[in-house]
A protein has these predicted regions:
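Acidic catalytic patch
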Residues: 16, 42-46, 74-98
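Short, well-structured N-terminal submotif of metal-dependent ribonuclease cores
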Residues: 1-40, 55-68, 132
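Short beta-strand scaffold positions
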Residues: 5, 39-40, 82, 105, ...
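Alpha-helix/helix-capping structural signal
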Residues: 8-9, 43, 86, 109, ...
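Generic alpha-helical structural context detector
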Residues: 12, 50-53, 71, 93
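Acidic, PIN/NYN-like endoribonuclease modules and their adjacent C-terminal/linker elements
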Residues: 2, 111-143
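A mid-sequence interfacial segment
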Residues: 83-119
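Short active-site oxyanion
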Residues: 34-38, 78-79, 116-121
C-alpha cells in the first residue's frame, strides 16, 4: 500500500505532546516497511518546520529540534516527492477552477504529489479539503 502523509498527520505523529499523537504515530509507523511505502512532498517538509516551531507547547520545539525531526524521522522513512513550477500552477488551476480560495491550494499540492507517487491513500485531518478538490480514486482518511 502506498500512502501520502499530510502535515496535519505528520506533525502529531512526531510530537507526543499533541492530542492526536496516539492516532497518528501508529499510522506513520505502519509505513516504515513490510511492503508499505510512505510519501510526502517537499512542501510538507516546510509546513512541518513552520508548524512545529510555532506550536504553543510546554516543551517547545526549537529550530534545530524541528530540523532533526524532519531530517531523521520524515526524510529517512518517507519518499519525498519534489514539486516544481508546473505542479504549483496545476494546484492553482485546480482550486481556482473549483472556486476554492486560500490555504486549500496547499492541499492541492499534496494531492498532486500523491497522484504522482500513485498513492492509494492520503492521511490527513483535512479530509473535506481533499474531497472538495477532487481526489478521484485516492482514499482520503484521518488516522
Amino acid at each position: 500500500m502506498k500512502a501520502f502523509f499530510d502535515t496535519s498527520v505528520l506533525v502529531p505523529a512526531m510530537v507526543d505532546q499533541l492530542r492526536n499523537h496516539a492516532r497518528c504515530f501508529p499510522a506513520f509507523r505502519e509505513y516504515f516497511g513490510d511492503g508499505n511505502e510512505g510519501f510526502c512532498s517537499t512542501h510538507v517538509l516546510a509546513e512541518c518546520y513552520s508548524v512545529m516551531t510555532a506550536l504553543p507547547l510546554r516543551r517547545r520545539i526549537g529550530p534545530l529540534d524541528a530540523q532533526r525531526l524532519i531530517r531523521d524521522t520524515v526524510t529517512r522513512r518517507l519518499t519525498v516527492i519534489s514539486l516544481g513550477t508546473d505542479d504549483y500552477l496545476e494546484a492553482i488551476d485546480r482550486v481556482s477552477g473549483n472556486g476554492l480560495v486560500s490555504g486549500i491550494v496547499y492541499d492541492a499540492l499534496h494531492l498532486i504529489a500523491a497522484e504522482r507517487a500513485a498513492c492509494e491513500r492520503i492521511y490527513t485531518f483535512n479530509v473535506d479539503h481533499f474531497q472538495r478538490i477532487g481526489a478521484g480514486p485516492i482514499a482520503i482518511t484521518a488516522p
